Amino acid sequence: MILDKFKNIVNLSNSNTEKEEGKNAEINENNDPNTQLAHEPSIVEADEKTFFDEMLGAPQYTYDEFLQVLKNPIEERGDTEDMKKHWGYPRRWKVILWDLHIQNYMNNDFNAFVDFDFGGNREECRIQRGSTMKIYAKGKTKNCLRTPVVTNVATEQKKNMNFRNVFEYRGSYLDLENEKLRIRVWEYKQFTLNKLEGIYEEPLLSFAVGEIYNETTLYKFIKDSRVKRCRLYFQLYFQELYDFELSFLNWSFSDLLSSSYIQAKSYNYLSNKNNVKKRYIDDTSCNIFPHMCKNFKRFHKKKIYRKVRNYDIDKNFSFNTALSDDSDERKNKNDRTIKNLEKLFVRNLTLMQNIEENEDMSYKNLQNINLPNPRVTITLSHTPKGHEGLNIISIEQKSIRFPIWENLGEIYFRGTLRDLDVSYLNIKVEDMSAPKSAREIGTCQISLKGIVDYPYVMHELEAPSWLVKEAKYEGWENKLNEWKLGTVEGKVIINRVPRYRQRGDIYHIDSKQPYLIVHIFNIDKIITVDNIKELDTYVEVSFDETSRRTRLMKKTLSPNYDSQISIPLRFNNKNDINYENLSKKGLIYIDVWGKSEDIVYIGGISISPYEIFFNEKNVRRNKTKLEHIDLETNVKITYDTVVYRGCKKLCFLHDDQRMSNIHFSIWTYPDILGNSTNQKKIVAPVSFNTTMNFPIKLAEKYNKLKKLFMEVLKTIKSIPENCTDVNTSTRFYNYELINQRKEKHFLPTLITSIKSPYCAESMNAIFHYVRCIPFIHKKENIIFTPDFTLQLKGGNALDHSLLLCSLFLGIPVLAFVCFGTLWDKQKHSWVATFEYNDEKNYGIVKFWETTTGNVYILKKRFIDHNRLKGLELKLKESKYKSHLRNGFLQRYENNTDINYIKEQTKRHIKQLFKNRINDIPIGGPSLPYKTIDLIFNHKNIYVNLQHSSPLNIWYDYWKFDFWFPFSSIEYNLQPSFTIKSFTHKMEDMELDKIAKELRTNIEKNINIYRASRNLSTRWNRDETLEIFLQVGLELLHQLNTSRKEDVLLAKLKIEDWKKALYHKVPQSHRLLGFPYHFNTYKSKFISDKLISTLAILESRDRSLCLSLAVCLYSLPGNFISCYIYIITCVKITQRELRKMEIIKEKAQRMAEIKNSQKKKKSSDDQNIDIKTMDDVEEKETFSSTNLDDTLHDEHTDIDTEKKKHEKDNYKNKKIKNTKLKDANIDNEEKDDHHHITDKKVSKSSDLIHSFDKNDISKNTFDKEEFINNLDKDKKYSSFKKGNVVNKKVSIKNEPSINIYEDHKIYDDENISNNIDNMENNQDEIYNLRQGKTIINEFQQVKKPQKYTINEKRDDIKTKKKRSKEKKKQDKLEFEKLIQSNAYFEQEKKKLQEDIKKLEKDKEQFQKEKIRREEKEKQLLLEEKIKLQKEKELFENEKLERKMSYMLKINELEKKKNERNKMEKSYKRMIQKDKEKKKKKESRDKIRRGEEEKMSADENMKEEQKMREEQKVGEEQKVGEEQKVGEEQKLREEQKMREEQKMREEQKMREEQKMREEQKVREEQKMREEQKMREEQKMREEQKVREEQKLREEQKMREEQKMREEQKMREEEKIREEEQMKREKKMRREEKKKRVQEPIKIDEIQVYDIIKNEKMKKKEEKEEKKRKKKKEDIEDKYKIGKEASLDENNNERQIKSKNIQEISDYEYKNIKENKNLNKFDEKLDLNQIYSKASNFYDNQEKKRRTIKVHANRKENSDSTFSHIDDSIKNKKEYLEDSNIARYLYEKRKHDLIGKGNYNFDEPHYGKKMNNVAYQDIKGSNLFKGFIEEPSSKKSPQKKKIVIVRKN
């Protein structure tokens, strides 16, 4: 090979030849290129030069090292065998190299050829063997290519090398990283060795991922510097040959027409050309009148009235009464507008009636016509050679219009990704019941571009060829455009895809297919709004639902593209290739795009097909001959076609008068105009109009509909009467908008149903996807269509709402775009979705705000919710159900007369406005929208005829008295745009790189910001903490993208994560967490946002520590969802702890005051109406009707407290309307009285039985509490009667009829049994009412089962005897108790006053304590301050001495430098003088020699004069040469002097730098000394604090002892009381036994003695146990005391504060809540974390913080310990399944992202280990936040202190 001539070269130090070569090269660059070289280098010199260039950068080894390198094993990647095979399996790659150009940068011409080494790992190495250097090569080459020689490549000339090669490369994915493409450019020499001019190397992976078009510059080393030699331009197609498996799933067809139907319909045009039938539609899809416009009678009114009541509608509550008090005037205005609307609608009956105006026929008009038997065939077209004829044929289905094939099958396709993108699917639908000639009923072609990333397919079927011919022959071709032959929907899923993708398009033509070819030349000047100086640009051409791009031109504003684009033309048949069909495909759009940090739209133009073939004078253009060369076969094809060459001005989005022209040419392959038959009839197309693509009937009446629309707005008075343009109004009533191409479009044409590429079923995920598109502020009133916003990657709120609505329609969902105004009167748009709640049976409206991410929910906003339910079911129903429903309607409907329909519509309009419901819904969330003006979807526009506020209207858009439709018929409109395929997600390597840069830049910017404020930043980069934070970000992303069913689970996961974070917080620290979400990855924008919003970044606390987590998700369309989580941890100071204590104490006081006030109010209310027992008995208190009053319980209340509060507020506002509702409410109460009484009786009986079952009797029973409860019951019974009047005033949100539907209704048998039980237990109830507190009786009630039957009988007898005697006494006692109520209340008041006094005394005592402590602290601080001041003075003096000494040294150094400068300058002057003298002497010598010669020559003869003159001329020449040499010497001397000057200046600069560095060091020393002083201060303060803490701890321990002793005493008292009770029980039992069975006294005494002995033994055992417990507690206390001295100061502080904070009530709760530290699934659903997604909390701010309690571990007197709890937690962790454990299992090895389209793989910007959840839980997450005191630093600090003291 090439290196054979270098075998014997040993040294590489021969640099003389290289220098000479460099000098010659420099001379050659300066000379002209045409002149020949004076001296050509020898062969040896050329060899050495090429060797130097080739071996530059080659690795150098010793011989042993080289042998080790050869023995290294082959690299492998992957943990499993499958992954190893994935990376190491050799694959096939298709390579095409063509369009190679070379450009010379040198001044000399040269003959060039190029070598390409594609692949292979051959590498030359320099090896030292002893004293010699040798070259060895390792590895092999795979593909070597060489171009032909190109002669005379001139300077700055771009010359084509006419080289093209196609081959296959074989290598694995690892080989792409290791192997390279090596390019060598050689200069061809005819008689000597060829000369190497430059080498270029690049790994193959960069070409497999990069652009197809490549430009590279090659450099040459001349005089140890790199110089540009030449530039290569080439196109390299490098893609993997892959076996794709196309699986066709869920393919469905809708609205198919049978062949017999098509023939009958075409025959109908011939038979009835003039009499075309119109029919009335009653289908819910396009019917405004829901009940066939029938007459309404009185019973219909009653039904409407009942519906109104069922939906909480108040008839007398009108349109405007809810908003102001002047309801009468507003009513009159409202009535006027309603009358005017009625008149207007009657006048325009032809526009309002619901008649189908399309001339289609349905199955109901035809007889003996069957439904189709469809069969589908799918074939691939435009495929590479060898793939023609690949097809799938489905199974035939019989008599169905909506067929579905869940799995059509698979097609196996071998090729590259580009081959797949270029190919098309030809779909043919056949009716197998028809003959062969007319079997085809629909065809279409679908492009497969982007099918790998976006698998959804949807298209409309076109007419078959036999039908088109028939229509042309019979003359009804225009009517064929209105036909709807059906639609296709389906999925083409490709499970496995190549790993790498190449960017860019190829110009390729298949000779069998027609193409539109566009040649883009250049653009004069690119103009932008911001006047960007450099921009990367490309041109995109789109036509016939396909688009192609040119190559990218970098960093130029006048790009020269010179690239051709080929767009395949879709024709169903070869006979259809003509101008007529080409012109139907629309305009050709050429757009120019730019790439910088953001994507920029520069401008665009549009061209009609007519302009290609005809000039401005409507004359056909001439044909020209063109050539095409096939890439793979290299075969030339010549053809004749019409070429249009032109230049057009770009149309900008902004208003700009500057010129920017694009030069291009367009033609077709083959010539399409030659195939057209009717060339004479071709007419120039009409300019663009909004009604261009409308149905014919809608286009005819469009102007009338616009006039009616304006008249409706004027009658509502939302627009002034003089207004002619809607754009000038303050409200948002636009029905047309201008798009990016400056074309006006009807609003419904700007929306269409699009299947979402990201989580197609989740509305939250789609909303999140749309919000990840950046927002752009637009000055011009222009809207972007959804495809344009996706391509531009930006838009305003209206553009986002259009895209969001179209994605919602693809789910499918009832979605609308809303136009309205904000509270600042700005026009705004948002999205609304209508849903039906099955559980609660009402309709819901959701407003999706794209700018803020909020979702507002309005409940109960539909009157006819059944209609809403039907519409929702119809959207979600399957195709088969829709087939059955549609077929039934079409077959069994009857024709109606048009005049009859007009009369019915008249009646219906009048009756609608008569029975118009004037009530409005009230309540709801606070909305940012002031008005809602209109809503629209992809079919129609609806104008709001109700109130302007979105809260106070009904959303039944099908009722035209609420919402006026723009058109009475919902037409199927074609959208004004075509959705291009969504681009693929960003590559993992790029995302990881972006995440790393973002992470580092954010940290860097925060550090710079804090450093600018003289603040240091400390980062905690603990890996376990970062993993934990990243898990939190993943959970937040799950919540934002979860389905409706999974929202609760996502919230539970976040709550679980928060608990784990709380548990790991270190003591005496405060933690704050701030999660953020951004739709960009610009580090500057994100860091500025963080700095501006986070005020804690400005804190000067030295203990502040930060931690950062970054998580990026790649979304379809090359969008990024960026999550950032910042945690700040700060140490809590004593002041903050005191403040927290004060705040807690204040809150407790306020709560106590409120409770006391409530008790006072309740006691005052009880004194109002106090009934005596006689009054109760006279009114039959114990009857079934009044039991609810006597035994009223809180659980039996009908209304909750919230509803009562709403009632009271509502009464005060709406007292005027109460009189009109009294009669209705009274009737309702009478009707439901019997039902209510039965319910109350059943509840009261259950309550009575609860006395028997529940534990009523406790150890102590207070009379006061029992009497108070009794008084409350009495008060409720008396207060209820007074509430009867108040009920008439109250207006509920729910109807009075359905109040009791949710409760269970008891049976009659249960009620009778309950009443019997009540009569048996009357005595017990009576005693309870009296408030008797005898313990024995309550024990009998509690435990009746312990007694025998005889004992019960005796008790009953005794009770009957005593009951008669006690009745009289009971009455008297009851009266006394009633009289004594006042006394008890007085005592209560006195007790409350005493309590308040005690509280005040406590507060004063605490304040005095605080004052004393503060005084002591102040004294200590003053002493410390004095000492510190003295130290500072001493240190300042030292610093001043040092500074003065340093200044003196600096002055001396300056003087020395000045002296040195003076000496050097003096020496230079002396040298200059010497040089001048030498020059003068040389000149004088020359003059003298010339004078002597002249004197000698004068004596010569005249004959010798001529010779002498010649000699003189020669001497003059020599003198001139000497002068030139001297001048050169002078120049060289000047250069040397200048170099010396430069060196001296550099020395001076270095000296200055050294001085500055010394100054900086001194300043640093000063700062360090200051820091040391501050640290000493802090230490002294810490010592003082520690002493205070010790004192406080001692106090707290003494208080603990006192509390423990008090508790022991209380326990002993309780035990004694229990013993007394037991003894009493025993005595009573003994008495009863004596009555029943007489026993001897001796036996009784013996029994008693035995009993007493047993009781004594038990008591002794219990006392021993108590003593042991006391001793154990004392031992624990001693041990704790010793351990507490060794613990950290922070823990002591927190524990002491914790004991002070916890009250007795909280101490009880510690026992109940001891499992707070557990990390399990027992979560409180009422405390779910909902701030992250911001879906439901709309009033709260966007900033979200996670606050962690400083004191997490509680100390209690209970027996449990934290150690036992941790053991239990471990056991539960092993046994039970936990949500958190399920979450934190990371599945990195599963390649889910390759096959699942909805899988999101997070990117963190940092490689993290796969840590298990157990390790995270067991590790200390926050160890980096605490500064651990190191033993090494302390002695250093002590030394510094000693030095300072000395």
Swiss-Prot record:
PROSITE patterns: C2
Listed Basic residues bias regions: 1834-1846
Protein name: C2 domain-containing protein
UniProt xrefs under InterPro entries: C2_dom, C2_domain_sf, CEP76, CEP76_C, CEPT76/DRC7_peptidase-like_dom
Annotated ranges, domain C2: 497-623
Biased composition (Basic and acidic residues): 17-26, 1193-1211, 1230-1243, 1456-1474, 1481-1629, 1652-1663, 1670-1692
Stretches with biased composition (Polar residues): 27-36
Lineage of the organism: Eukaryota, Sar, Alveolata, Apicomplexa, Aconoidasida
Keyword Coiled coil listed: yes
Keywords: Calcium, Calcium/phospholipid-binding, Coiled coil, Exocytosis, Membrane
Gene Ontology biological process terms, A to Z: exocytosis; symbiont entry into host
Coiled-coil features, chain-numbered ranges: 1349-1506
